[in-house]
């Protein structure tokens, strides 16, 4: 990103293809060192990465070293993601994500009986690099892989394991009711008993077993 561009680094990052799930973290939140406690131990090139996020002038050595600049860019993306995971647990962050949720920016539940229920991003781990972002349906309370492949490489730690639950704790009025309908397997119009498959499996197993001769 060139220095002649007026758009901030945060707006640029959130506008990238594949980063649609992110909201723009307020710079005031990032500038409060208390909110960044411990992140310097998780992110390499922490100081330079933070300066990049806040659009501060980079060191001259960094401008003259393209390889180092790429490393700082990667570190800035990681740092922003970890800050983002904390920010969306605050009232301001929840408000921004709630707006995206209401607009369906995160997609809709593929389950038929959830009737196009909007979903929320969630991480299966709070540790970076362990799992990619998933989508949580508050109606069936299950998680799904994002439909678009461009979201398959977004780290789940940048949203955290508790975000959807925090949102509904703060705004319980947006929590949907559980699905009224449940799919019922049928064969020739009759409901299939839960034990039917097990009994059929046992019967097939007995049929395949060799008959023992009694002497």
Curated annotation (Swiss-Prot):
In terms of SUPFAM superfamilies, this protein maps to: Casein kinase II beta subunit (SSF57798)
Q: What is this protein called?
A: Casein kinase II subunit beta
From the record heading the sequence, give the disease linked to this protein: Poirier-Bienvenu neurodevelopmental syndrome: An autosomal dominant neurodevelopmental disorder characterized by onset of seizures in infancy, developmental delay, impaired intellectual development, and poor or absent speech.
Where, by residue number, is the motif KSSR motif? 147-150
Keyword Nucleotide-binding attached: no
The UniProt annotation puts the region (Interaction with alpha subunit) at 188-193
The organism encoding this protein is Homo sapiens (Human)
Q: How does it assemble?
A: Casein kinase II/CK2 is a tetramer composed of an alpha subunit, an alpha' subunit and two beta subunits. The beta subunit dimerization is mediated by zinc ions. Interacts with DYNLT2. Interacts with CD163. Also a component of a CK2-SPT16-SSRP1 complex composed of SSRP1, SUPT16H, CSNK2A1, CSNK2A2 and CSNK2B, the complex associating following UV irradiation. Interacts with MUSK; mediates phosphorylation of MUSK by CK2. Interacts with FGF1; this interaction is increased in the presence of FIBP, suggesting a possible cooperative interaction between CSNKB and FIBP in binding to FGF1. (Microbial infection) Interacts (via KSSR motif) with Epstein-Barr virus EBNA1; the interaction requires phosphorylation of EBNA1, is independent and simultaneous to EBNA1 interaction with USP7 as well as necessary for PML nuclear bodies disruption by EBNA1. EBNA1, USP7 and CSNK2B form a ternary complex.
Write out the residues that bind Zn(2+): 109, 114, 137, 140
PROSITE patterns listed in its UniProt record: CK2_BETA
List N-acetylserine occurrences by residue: 2
User: Main localization of the protein?
Assistant: nucleus
Give the organism's phylogenetic lineage: Eukaryota, Metazoa, Chordata, Craniata, Vertebrata
Q: Which GO terms describe its cellular component?
A: chromatin; cytoplasm; cytosol; extracellular exosome; extracellular region; fibrillar center; ficolin-1-rich granule lumen; nucleoplasm
User: Could you confirm whether the keyword DNA damage appears in this record?
Assistant: no
Q: Where is this cross-link: Glycyl lysine isopeptide (Lys-Gly) (interchain with G-Cter in SUMO2)?
A: 212
**Which chain positions lie within coiled-coil regions?**
none
Q: Which residues carry this modification: N6-acetyllysine?
A: 212
Entry note about domains: The KSSR motif is part of a protein interaction pocket that mediates interaction with cellular and viral proteins.
GO biological process assignments: adiponectin-activated signaling pathway; endothelial tube morphogenesis; negative regulation of blood vessel endothelial cell migration; negative regulation of cell population proliferation; negative regulation of proteasomal ubiquitin-dependent protein catabolic process; negative regulation of viral life cycle; peptidyl-threonine phosphorylation; positive regulation of activin receptor signaling pathway
Q: Which domain of life is it from?
A: Eukaryota
Q: Which UniProt keywords apply?
A: Acetylation, Disease variant, Epilepsy, Intellectual disability, Isopeptide bond, Metal-binding, Nucleus, Phosphoprotein, Ubl conjugation, Wnt signaling pathway, Zinc
Any one GO MF term held by the record is: protein serine/threonine kinase activity
Protein's job: Regulatory subunit of casein kinase II/CK2. As part of the kinase complex regulates the basal catalytic activity of the alpha subunit a constitutively active serine/threonine-protein kinase that phosphorylates a large number of substrates containing acidic residues C-terminal to the phosphorylated serine or threonine. Participates in Wnt signaling.
Any idea which residues bear Phosphoserine here?
Answer: 2-3, 8, 69, 209
């Amino acid at each position: 990103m060139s220095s002649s561009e007026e758009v901030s680094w945060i707006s640029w990052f959130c506008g990238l293809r594949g980063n649609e799930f992110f909201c723009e973290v307020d710079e005031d939140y990032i500038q409060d060192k208390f909110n960044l406690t411990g992140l310097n131990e998780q992110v390499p090139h922490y100081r330079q990465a933070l300066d990049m996020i806040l659009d501060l002038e980079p060191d001259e050595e960094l401008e003259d070293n393209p390889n180092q600049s790429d490393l700082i860019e990667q570190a800035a993306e990681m740092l922003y993601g970890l800050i983002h995971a904390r920010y969306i647990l605050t009232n301001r962050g929840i408000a921004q994500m709630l707006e995206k949720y209401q607009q369906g920016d995160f997609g809709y539940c593929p389950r038929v009986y959830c009737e196009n229920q909007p979903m929320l991003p969630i991480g299966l781990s709070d540790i970076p690099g362990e799992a990619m972002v998933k989508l949580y349906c508050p109606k069936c309370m299950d998680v799904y892989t994002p439909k678009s492949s461009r979201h398959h490489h977004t780290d789940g730690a940048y949203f955290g394991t508790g975000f959807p639950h925090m949102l509904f704790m703060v705004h319980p009025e947006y929590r949907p009711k559980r699905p009224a309908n449940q799919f019922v397997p049928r064969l020739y119009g009759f409901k299939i008993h839960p034990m039917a498959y097990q009994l059929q499996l046992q019967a097939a197993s007995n049929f395949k077993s060799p008959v023992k001769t009694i002497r």
